[in-house]
């Protein structure tokens, strides 16, 4: 099945290891299939992104070990141009159709959205709850801000935003913005930028948390 052309936008706690966890570990795959997305080819003259970004999919299992989280993670596609970004975004299920406890992530380069990854371990996330009727809007706006490097001036000189995530939960959904250096969070204006981008959204339970402060953090191994 050929992918339809991309629609260009206007300019501008972990469960103990066991059979139940193993049975639930498989994350859903986009209906078009990862194989078809892998067949995407950059278009001549495509607008390059400042950095490549990788879409990931997973399903969070309370109590899962770091190894189980890593094995549950599914790479969707690494995008390097604006056109390929929209081709992928438009051809994976909308976040509103994902099952409970599933998440999408967009991470810089090909780094994985795992707390204990060496390149992530000293960082953390800004985390906020989103009303379900606003999830799609918030996720899309954060994606565009991320690939457009709109957070570049919102982090300290030795820090950077390296990813965004959206997770489907019971009452409200959860969005997260990842940075690489938790010790410099006091100098960041990431939340101010998010409020500027989404002035009409009422976020709940907004806070920052270093990965190393999670009770399930397995330092040196490798999830959100």
UniProtKB/Swiss-Prot annotation:
Matching SUPFAM superfamilies: eIF4e-like (SSF55418)
Family named by the database record: Belongs to the eukaryotic initiation factor 4E family.
Annotated keywords: Initiation factor, Protein biosynthesis, RNA-binding, Translation regulation
Binding site for mRNA: 115-116, 169-174
Keyword Transit peptide: no
PANTHER family found in the cross-reference section: EUKARYOTIC TRANSLATION INITIATION FACTOR 4E RELATED (PTHR11960), EUKARYOTIC TRANSLATION INITIATION FACTOR 4E TYPE 3 (PTHR11960:SF66)
Pfam family for this entry, one: IF4E
Function according to Swiss-Prot or TrEMBL: Recognizes and binds the 7-methylguanosine-containing mRNA cap during an early step in the initiation of protein synthesis. May act as an inhibitor of EIF4E1 activity.
Protein name: Eukaryotic translation initiation factor 4E type 3
Top-level taxon of the source organism: Eukaryota
Record field: compositional bias (Low complexity): 1-27
GO molecular function list: RNA 7-methylguanosine cap binding; translation initiation factor activity
Any single biological process term in GO: regulation of translation
Tagged with keyword RNA-binding: yes
One Gene Ontology CC term in the entry: eukaryotic translation initiation factor 4F complex
Region (Disordered): 1-28
Classification via Gene3D superfamilies: RNA Cap, Translation Initiation Factor Eif4e
Self-association and partners: eIF4F is a multi-subunit complex, the composition of which varies with external and internal environmental conditions. It is composed of at least eIF4A, eIF4E and eIF4G. EIF4E3 interacts with EIF4G1, but not with EIF4EBP1, EIF4EBP2 and EIF4EBP3.
Native organism: Homo sapiens (Human)
